[in-house]
């Protein structure tokens, strides 16, 4: 194996977020409020299964232990199960997860697990069906809930649920969410609303700090857990009376980036060192055949020298990210 990916600030990178499409069939207010608009990339322009196999092989050789498949909505790809299987070929990759809107969970989750999927994150921003539809533009609440149940039935011991925290939308519904996870092994992750190029007005109206929830959880006796090296950025809390857990993702905290352990590759094969940042490093010309792996690994390693110490969000810098479907959130 080549040397472990490490940047100039001695941060080690064990986690790859790999976008496989930017297409989504939901119209979430904080991501694609006007629905998906093609950016000139056709479905044939997204990374192929073979390209995904090569890029994940290179990252595995460089110490990656976890790959998360993102979008857009990853399950809209007809070859999604094949993609999972291709990533699974790498023995060094111990965890393969997906972030999904849950649209196809009920139908396909058992097949995904058989192909090698080990983790699921489902986006659910409200437990009220009408509010869910208002946020997502889709009347699919019951379908998504059935999908979460199907994930447990398929053998997943835990399901993570992502909830974007929004003032006057769901920030006051903590008790409802806590009741939901009391007897279910769900890690409910509240994610602070992030400002993007297309979402400034929404951010000003609905942003609220996760610190408010953290203070309330601590007041109620929830206990902060230690992170593992391939975990995402969530601060996770547990409580002896609950089967579920609470996670808080607060990107506006000053030291949020100090423990960064993840890199991103977009659906068209660009390496992004940060969700909010530069235009990306093209990898696609080195994904054409298996003989290029050494050069591919060298380019990835060299790019890491340019990774900045922080995303500067706390200094009101939103980078180039127009919306969160662009490189997989």
Swiss-Prot record:
Gene name linked to the record: moaA
In terms of superkingdom, the source organism counts as Bacteria
Q: Does the keyword rRNA processing apply?
A: no
Q: Which cysteines are joined by disulfide bonds?
A: none
Residues given in the record as [4Fe-4S] cluster 1 binding sites? 24, 28, 31
Species assigned in the record: Escherichia fergusonii (strain ATCC 35469 / DSM 13698 / CCUG 18766 / IAM 14443 / JCM 21226 / LMG 7866 / NBRC 102419 / NCTC 12128 / CDC 0568-73)
Annotated GO molecular function terms are: 4 iron, 4 sulfur cluster binding; cyclic pyranopterin monophosphate synthase activity; GTP 3',8'-cyclase activity; GTP binding; metal ion binding; S-adenosyl-L-methionine binding
Name of this protein: GTP 3',8-cyclase
> What's the family?
Belongs to the radical SAM superfamily. MoaA family.
Organism classification: Bacteria, Pseudomonadati, Pseudomonadota, Gammaproteobacteria, Enterobacterales
List cofactor names only. Answer: [4Fe-4S] cluster
Task: Indicate the segments forming the Radical SAM core domain, all copies.
Answer: 8-234
Positions with a binding annotation for GTP: 17, 68, 99, 160, 262-264
